[in-house]
Amino acid sequence: VGYNIDSLIGEIRGILRTSGQHNIALIGAGDLGRAIASSTVFADHGFHIAGVFDSDPRKVGTQISSLSVQNPATLVETVREKNIIVGVLAVPPAAAQPAADALVEAGVKIIFSYSDALIDTPPDVTVHRSSPAAALLYALYFHLT
């Protein structure tokens, strides 16, 4: 009697395409990028950070968790080599468009941005934005009304 929960979870994951592992590229090795790379939030949902990239020469070659920060010049090769399908932007607003352009050039079709900058991409590239300030304002609005 009841539902086979394991089977149900498996079916839902299949529909949402969260079964298996999806490789992502993280652009930005500053405070936010380090926090993302050190967190299990993506891994818990089937995403593996397969590469971390930063244009700051002082950060290239440093380690975040088990990942070595790479120069963005290696992005295209890494995306193709590791079958990366998602790019995560953890960069300042001024760096968001150039970083998105590099991801698009590499063949990434999904970009998740923590930047407040509006990003222009071709129609076949999906951009999702997550702004902590906007989320806080949204929560505050509904709490106060």
Task: Tell where the protein language model's regions lie, with residue ranges.
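Short, glycine/polar-rich helix-capping loops at beta-to-alpha or helix-loop-helix junctions
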Residues: I119
